[in-house]
Amino acid sequence: LPISVFKVIRESWRGGQKTTTRTDYIKRVIGLPNDTIQMKEGRLYINGVKVARRPDGNFTPSARDGITYRQFIETLPNGVEHKILELGDNQRFDNTPIFKVPPNHYFMMGDNRDNSNDSRADVSFVPAENLVGRADIMFLSIDWRSEDWTDFDADIRWDRMLSAIGP
């Protein structure tokens, strides 16, 4: 399943005026129409089957906040492998109800599992008409959590520039 770009459109009323906002997200397609998705103790289940994963060391971002993520390689039911990051197995979205993906909708998740605003949160299911495209190349990568955010050049992650996204 590809990493996809999709839009979330929100409408609200302020001062008698209707306001519409659009936010683009880039997340991995995890659930297709009619699939069931659940997280149990930090593990992903698709249609009741635990998705395989194996340890792949640790990852420490360049920011000096001292956080180290556990890194895993996850294998989706179609055989596609990708890396995921986790802080632990009892974080905010590590134990969810079963999500049943409605017809013509998709369930999206970020690869940084414990720090992702995705279908487990307020993004919810993504209607097919909100899919914008597939993400294939990392154009620009910035460490926004760097302590010295005023030094823009130092925050660019040059090793990720123009690299392929996927699978």
Each language-model region and where it sits:
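Soluble "head" domains of membrane/secretory-pathway proteins
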Residues: P2-P167
